[in-house]
């Protein structure tokens, strides 16, 4: 049976994949993540997830390689990682009372057979109306500077929301496990008996 590789160095994706109790290794993909001119969010995450998985095929020639990529969209614009507290406050003020959509691209590449499975999972975050003081307090407490959308749903960020809508809550953290389990079963790797 091919071994499993996660084409990511994200500690959040690693922690999610560990839930499936299948042995795996992590490896850093070498992919230019620059969007193509006019590329829609769904196409971008799909292309990058596929590129990440396939970029490791030469290093791991008999493996199942998982690639994943995620972007955050607010008012039709891709929202990146804020990197500064001021930008985090601006992003959260813009998200206040709005719906932020996350698109997570997922690819599973069998490097032995060349078989590729892909999917894009959307996930909507409905923000409640936030006061300036709440935004300041949140940024000070959680420091979400390296999180798209300026929040951590697995932490205190949950206090910012009115509701969440999506097929799989893991999608919001960066790895849609329900879709991944379906893909793995198609490759004869069932997490329940692996």
UniProtKB/Swiss-Prot annotation:
Entry's localization field: Cytoplasm
Q: Which GO terms describe its biological process?
A: nucleotide metabolic process
Cofactor(s) needed, names only, are: a divalent metal cation
Question: Could you name the active-site residues?
Answer: 69 (proton acceptor)
Task: Pinpoint the site Important for substrate specificity.
Answer: 12, 70, 154
SUPFAM superfamilies, per database record: ITPase-like
The reaction(s) catalysed by this protein are:
N(7)-methyl-GTP + H2O = N(7)-methyl-GMP + diphosphate + H(+)
What protein family does this chain belong to?
A: Belongs to the Maf family. YceF subfamily.
Sum up the protein's function in the record's words: Nucleoside triphosphate pyrophosphatase that hydrolyzes 7-methyl-GTP (m(7)GTP). May have a dual role in cell division arrest and in preventing the incorporation of modified nucleotides into cellular nucleic acids.
* Protein's recorded name: 7-methyl-GTP pyrophosphatase
Organism the protein comes from: Salmonella typhi
Coding gene? yceF
């Amino acid at each position: 049976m091919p071994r499993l590789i996660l084409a990511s160095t994200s500690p959040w994706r690693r922690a999610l994949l560990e839930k499936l109790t299948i042995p795996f290794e992590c490896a850093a993909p070498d992919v230019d993540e620059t969007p193509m001119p006019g590329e829609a969010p769904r196409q971008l995450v799909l292309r990058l997830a596929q590129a990440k998985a396939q970029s490791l095929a030469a290093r791991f020639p008999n493996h199942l390689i998982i690639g994943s990529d995620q972007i955050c969209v607010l008012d039709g614009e891709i929202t990146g990682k804020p990197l500064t507290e001021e930008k985090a406050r601006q992003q959260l003020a813009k998200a206040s009372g709005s719906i932020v959509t996350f698109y997570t691209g997922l690819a599973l590449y069998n490097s032995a057979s060349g078989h590729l499975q892909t999917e894009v999972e959307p996930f909507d975050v409905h923000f409640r109306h936030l006061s300036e003081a709440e935004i300041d307090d949140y940024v000070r407490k959680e420091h979400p500077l390296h999180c798209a959308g300026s929040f951590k749903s697995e932490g205190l960020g949950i206090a910012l929301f009115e509701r969440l809508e999506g097929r799989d809550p893991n999608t919001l953290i960066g790895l849609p496990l329900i879709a991944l389990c379906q893909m793995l079963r198609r490759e004869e790797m069932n997490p329940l008996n692996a």
